[in-house]
Amino acid sequence: MKLGIIGAGAVGFAVGYTAARMGIASDIKYNDIIEERAKAQAMDIEDASSFYPHYVKMSWGSYKDMADRDIIVTATGSLDGVRDRLEEYEMFKDATEAYVKEIVAAGFKGIFIVVGNPCDLMADLVYRASGFPKERVIGSGTALDTTRLNTTLCKLLEIDPSDVRGVVLGEHGESQFVAWSNIFVNNLQLDEYLKQNPASFSRDDVENLVRERAWRVIDGKGHTQCGIGNTVCSMIDAIVKDRKKVILVATLMEGMYDLNDIYLSTPCVLGKNGMEKAIELKLTDEELERLKHSEKVLKANREKYK
């Protein structure tokens, strides 16, 4: 599989290195506005070739050179000095729209995975700029937030993370929320599990911990990396290996939850054709209202910077 990565910063590097370590790409090409950084990241990953499952061809190139890629990950942007991902939209929307159009004009026929923040609005932008069907433009959405939730709950409940099936919906940002009615632990709905295995914790505190986790990491080391790198590569793996795996990603709302014309996160089946099926969960009235609030926040910001 030929993988293209736009943006060779911390996140772009993490995606490329993880893809090489997992053996899900045979050819990885970087692009960055700083060409020397793209070259350096490619060479650094190539230097570990002896430790990968198979040889991975590493290179760097222009937007036009991305035309032959099977999957392109857009990892552009920066959270330096920013405390709300939505602030990045005005900063990077024009550049993103321009390079997407250039890549598509060069003949790209694959799948876009949009990671750069604000990833919901950027996925919406890539969808419109590319002219691709929604199945071939996927936002990383709340996939990472959901793994953060699972990790938080597994520590509170003292169980393995794989035994928790959490759900974070809405925007990948300040208006995201935990859909508590859809959390399962060892195949039991959370409330039922807690009746049998009592544990005391504040749900509001859990939501805040999940929402603020990225900022705590950024404050400490300047960027997030490992979580998002593995999250995106789980999406790539599901597509490349046609796993039909359900992952919380951002997709175009076309009537689900009575929402329309915006990218938001919901469980989606990922396979060889990209986003193959979006799943509408049964939510409480409060959860539906919070999801609609996310829609309003994103649409307001899209309109603001039109």
Predicted regions span which residues?
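NAD(P)+-binding Rossmann beta1-loop-alpha1 motif at the extreme N-terminus of oxidoreductases
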Residues: 1-41
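Short glycine/serine/threonine-rich phosphate/pyrophosphate-binding segments
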Residues: 11-15, 82, 119-124
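Short, well-ordered alpha-helices that flank and scaffold nucleotide-derived cofactor binding pockets
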Residues: 17-21, 43, 47, 101, ...
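Conserved N-terminal Rossmann-fold NAD(P) cofactor-binding segment
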Residues: 33-70, 84, 299-304
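Rossmann-like NAD(P)-binding element
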Residues: 54-111
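Glycine-/Pro-rich loop/turn segments that contact NAD(P) or position catalytic residues
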Residues: 87-104, 110-159
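C-terminal substrate-binding/catalytic lobe of Rossmann-fold NAD(P)-dependent dehydrogenases
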Residues: 130-136, 145-306
